[in-house]
Swiss-Prot record:
Belongs to the tannase family. The lineage of its organism: Eukaryota, Fungi, Dikarya, Ascomycota, Pezizomycotina. The gene is faeB-1. Disulfide bonds join 29-78, 64-117, 190-445, 259-276, 285-295, 505-527. Glycans are attached at residues 83, 101, 286, 354, 385. It comes from Aspergillus fumigatus (strain ATCC MYA-4609 / CBS 101355 / FGSC A1100 / Af293). This is Probable feruloyl esterase B-1. It catalyses: feruloyl-polysaccharide + H2O = ferulate + polysaccharide. Pfam families: Tannase.
Length: 528
């Protein structure tokens, strides 16, 4: 059942122009383009999308999935496609979806990686809840940094401008389409989308009343350097420093052996990675070992230790935290494969050095220093002073998976502490507007081994109750003043049913198994 406060206004919706009969709504949509006269905005189309039809994706290029990204609409809405000019050398594409079941709420989605691609899945998810929803391509199409080459205007769009300008345009369209305008504005994004959410909080604190920021790529420039650093640590396949995927599996099993029970339950999930400080000398191969796929040489053990160590600059200053243990199975194919990391490579090629011939094999800490000094348009998004957002009455729900193999969850904890130190606030004082939830058993923005479906998107839907759904939780916090004390995640089975649930604690508290039920019993855990 849809949470009751989401239905405010729907009882009288039939009396409004936005949700009258299908025929009148269709006519309203088809003629809407005649009302749009916004500076630097070019309307490409306005399309009526009825219930049960394929959602048109005519402007989605093949590099972003093309028409294959389409899905069936569960509601009727008006799909508005536009190009927005940001300079004489740059523009971004955006869509606004204006539903007939409008609840008076506006929402912007974010992006991922270095793209370049409208988050249609998130738009579908938000629009079905009655949000007037927008998404942009963040200044370029495609999941590559090549469009940044020789074009700082495109970099500026990617850093902050496309999201902010798209939000301004989207709000204007919402006011034009619905006589009642909007009551509250929200943001939903993960990874790069998480960084965009934080950048908005830091630079444009009035843009959103509520922000859901997952696994944010904050401290972005150093994150790119961190991604480059792993090749320097592991070396190429076949080198004495390289650790094979089979050996990483042995490392993972050893990490679980040392750390799984620290939370009181042996369930294959690490609840608090801060407590996990594994020692890898236990995996050293002895002189008689025949099968060396499950043990490490001394050199390889040093490689593993370096992987799980923080990155420091040439001057000895901290740049980026360690990779949290528990992510190594997936990370061995992403960062530890000996082939470099595409997004890091692209950032250095097309932004730092503006040289498409730059090679990742030459990377050193001197390059990290050059990148950090550049930080175009403050894309790092690591400003610890978010007092503007606090004063504006904004609320932010920040989550991060503890099995994230792309952006270490230690980065989110580091930022939380940075905000606390910068603003001189205790956790209880931060609670009024900023709450962080580390999610055990969650990978990068998506489920992993544990109860990690928290309603951050259609693929992780586990109910409409705010305790099970971070989007509904931020709405309840903004509109009812009821802040989430925990986020309840669901472990989904292959048939879509729920195997078990677990409540994920608000940082800096940690989850502890206290019994007496099984570890699958959510009431057998306590935040301490």
């Amino acid at each position: 059942m849809m949470w009751w406060f989401l239905l405010i206004g729907l009882a009288s919706a039939a009396a409004t122009a936005s949700s009258a009969s299908s025929a009148s709504f269709e006519s309203r949509c088809q003629h809407f383009h005649k009302e749009i006269h916004l500076q630097n905005v070019h309307v490409l189309s306005t399309t009526y999308v009825p219930i049960g039809s394929n959602i048109p994706m005519v402007y989605n290029p093949p590099i972003c999935g093309g028409t294959a990204s389409s899905s069936i609409s569960t509601i009727q809405f008006c799909q508005v496609a536009l190009n927005v000019t940001t300079s004489d050398k740059s523009q971004f594409f955006m869509e606004a979806w204006l539903p007939s079941n409008y609840t008076g709420r506006f929402l912007s989605t974010g992006n991922g990686g270095l793209n370049g691609c409208v988050s249609y899945a998130d738009m579908v998810y938000a629009t079905q809840y009655g949000f007037a929803t927008i998404g942009t391509n963040n200044g370029h199409f495609g999941d590559t940094g090549q469009y940044f080459l020789n074009n700082p205007e495109v970099i500026e769009d990617f850093a902050y401008r496309a999201l902010h300008t798209g939000t301004v345009v989207g709000k204007a369209l919402t006011k034009l389409f619905y006589p009642q305008g909007y009551k509250n504005s929200y943001y939903l994004g993960c990874s790069t989308g998480g960084r965009q959410g934080w950048k908005s909080i830091q630079r444009f604190p009035d843009d959103f009343d509520g922000v859901v920021a997952g696994a944010p790529a904050i401290n972005f420039v150093n994150l790119c350097s961190w991604g480059s650093r792993f090749l320097k640590i592991t070396g190429p396949p076949g080198s004495e420093t390289f650790v094979t995927s089979a050996q990483w599996s042995a490392v993972h099993n050893e990490i679980l052996r040392q750390c799984d029970a620290l939370d009181g339950a042996v369930d294959g999930i690490i609840e608090d990675t801060d407590l996990c400080q594994p020692v890898f000398e236990t995996l050293l191969c002895n002189s008689t070992a025949v099968d060396k796929t499950s043990c490490l040489t001394g050199v390889q053990a040093n490689t593993v230790n370096e992987v799980f160590s923080a990155m420091y600059g040439l001057d000895g200053k901290w740049l980026y935290p360690r990779m949290q243990p528990g992510s190594e199975l997936a990370a061995s194919f992403i960062y530890y494969s000996g082939n470099g990391f595409k997004y890091s490579d692209d950032w250095y090629k097309y932004v730092v050095y503006n040289d498409s011939n730059w090679g990742h094999s030459t990377w050193t800490l001197a390059d990290a220093a050059a990148a950090a000094a550049q930080d175009p348009f403050q894309i790092s998004s690591f400003d610890g002073n978010i007092s503007g957002f606090q004063k504006a009455g904004g609320k932010v729900l920040h989550y991060h998976g503890l099995e994230d193999a792309i952006i270490t969850s230690d980065s989110s904890k580091a930022y939380y502490k940075h905000v606390a130190d910068t603003m001189g606030l205790s956790p209880s004082e931060l609670d009024h507007f900023y709450r962080l939830f580390p999610i055990s058993g969650m990978g990068h923005c998506s489920p992993g081994t544990g109860a990690a479906s928290i309603g951050q998107g259609s693929s992780t839907y586990a109910g409409d109750d705010p305790q099970d759904n971070v989007l509904m939780a931020i709405v309840q916090w903004v509109e009812k003043g009821i802040a989430p004390e925990y986020v309840r995640g669901s472990k989904m089975s292959r048939d879509g049913t729920i195997d078990y649930r677990r409540k994920h604690c608000k940082y800096p508290k940690r989850n502890r198994y206290v019994g007496p039920g099984k570890y699958t019993d959510e009431n057998a855990w306590k935040c301490v």
